[in-house]
């Protein structure tokens, strides 16, 4: 296993996506416990992936991208992130949090 350390960074868009889903579950579906559990699961999944961010298959996209996207599945949702080489650091940049049935190619 590599000794590579990754710096974790989030895009504001990820926070917007996450907040939208959490608020919907808590307020519209009236299930704050499920919303809190989802939030905990998302946080745990990201931190578990951080030590080996590039050890998983990249997402194959029809679009040409500067950095390949990787996925983390959490319940009915998908977290999308990229790994950016910034000199001495490698950054795991978490970009989107989408419902797994959304049309991904239109939003990422």
Task: Please report, for each region that a protein language model flagged, where it lies by residue.
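Arg/Lys-rich, positively charged N-terminal/basic patches that mediate binding to nucleic acids
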Residues: 1-41
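A short, surface-exposed loop/turn module that caps and links secondary-structure elements
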Residues: 44-73
């Amino acid at each position: 296993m590599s000794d590579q350390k990754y710096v974790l960074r989030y895009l504001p868009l990820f926070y917007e996506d996450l907040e939208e889903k959490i608020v919907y579950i808590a307020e519209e579906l009236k299930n704050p416990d499920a919303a809190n559990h989802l939030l905990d699961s998302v946080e745990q999944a990201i931190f578990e992936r951080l030590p080996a961010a590039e050890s998983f298959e990249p997402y194959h996209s029809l679009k040409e991208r500067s950095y390949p996207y990787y996925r983390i599945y959490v319940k009915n949702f998908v977290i999308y992130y990229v790994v950016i080489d910034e000199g001495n650091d490698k950054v795991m940049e978490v970009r989107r949090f989408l419902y797994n049935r959304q049309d991904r190619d239109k939003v990422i």
